[in-house]
């Protein structure tokens, strides 16, 4: 343990178009090799495509999608008496959001559309409707936590 105190949490600046910190976080997750401009272009074009597909406010659709992706429970490995147990535990809100964003981008890249903006738009719309690969990942995580509920008393 470090004796120099706690590390201060860095705050992200809101993006210029939607004035939202959440959008900046998504752009930072999409970004590769420091190419933020390209990541912004991809995300903003994907939101335009989402608006065309759903005829709704794109940021609302994105928030609905993220709420459907963010997990509430996860399993963590705990070693007790020479055995490893998968112990279900709640996830704090910041980690829920970051996991949701990472899963969204990860499963978007695995999609078989032509361009990244098309893949991202399709995954956002699917997730907002409650289906899609990233929503399945959340359900799978919750299923694992439910199956290991018997070990919840090992929580720390």
Curated annotation (Swiss-Prot):
<dbReference type="GO" id="GO:0015935">
    <property type="term" value="C:small ribosomal subunit"/>
</dbReference>
<dbReference type="GO" id="GO:0000049">
    <property type="term" value="F:tRNA binding"/>
</dbReference>
<dbReference type="InterPro" id="IPR036823">
    <property type="entry name" value="Ribosomal_uS7_dom_sf"/>
</dbReference>
<comment type="similarity">
    <text>Belongs to the universal ribosomal protein uS7 family.</text>
</comment>
<dbReference type="GO" id="GO:0003735">
    <property type="term" value="F:structural constituent of ribosome"/>
</dbReference>
<protein>
    <recommendedName>
        <fullName>Small ribosomal subunit protein uS7</fullName>
    </recommendedName>
</protein>
<keyword id="KW-0687">Ribonucleoprotein</keyword>
<comment type="subunit">
    <text>Part of the 30S ribosomal subunit. Contacts proteins S9 and S11.</text>
</comment>
<dbReference type="InterPro" id="IPR023798">
    <property type="entry name" value="Ribosomal_uS7_dom"/>
</dbReference>
<dbReference type="InterPro" id="IPR005717">
    <property type="entry name" value="Ribosomal_uS7_bac/org-type"/>
</dbReference>
<keyword id="KW-0699">rRNA-binding</keyword>
<comment type="function">
    <text>One of the primary rRNA binding proteins, it binds directly to 16S rRNA where it nucleates assembly of the head domain of the 30S subunit. Is located at the subunit interface close to the decoding center, probably blocks exit of the E-site tRNA.</text>
</comment>
<dbReference type="InterPro" id="IPR000235">
    <property type="entry name" value="Ribosomal_uS7"/>
</dbReference>
<dbReference type="GO" id="GO:0006412">
    <property type="term" value="P:translation"/>
</dbReference>
<dbReference type="InterPro" id="IPR020606">
    <property type="entry name" value="Ribosomal_uS7_CS"/>
</dbReference>
<dbReference type="GO" id="GO:0019843">
    <property type="term" value="F:rRNA binding"/>
</dbReference>
<keyword id="KW-0820">tRNA-binding</keyword>
<keyword id="KW-0694">RNA-binding</keyword>
<keyword id="KW-0689">Ribosomal protein</keyword>
<dbReference type="Pfam" id="PF00177">
    <property type="entry name" value="Ribosomal_S7"/>
</dbReference>
């Amino acid at each position: 343990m470090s004796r120099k105190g706690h590390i201060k949490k860095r705050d992200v600046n809101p993006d210029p178009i939607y004035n939202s910190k959440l959008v900046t976080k998504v752009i930072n997750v999409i970004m590769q090799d420091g190419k933020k401009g390209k990541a912004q272009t991809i995300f903003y074009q994907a939101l335009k495509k989402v608006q065309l597909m759903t005829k709704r406010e794109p940021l609302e659709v994105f928030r609905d999608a993220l709420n459907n992706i963010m997990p509430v429970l996860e399993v963590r490995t705990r070693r007790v008496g020479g055995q490893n147990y998968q112990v279900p535990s709640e996830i704090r809100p910041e980690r829920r959001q970051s996991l949701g964003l990472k899963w969204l981008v990860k499963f978007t890249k695995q999609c078989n559309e032509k361009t990244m903006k098309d893949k991202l738009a399709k995954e956002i719309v699917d997730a907002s409707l409650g289906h899609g690969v990233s929503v399945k990942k959340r359900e799978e995580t919750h299923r694992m936590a439910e199956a290991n509920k018997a070990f919840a008393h090992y929580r720390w």
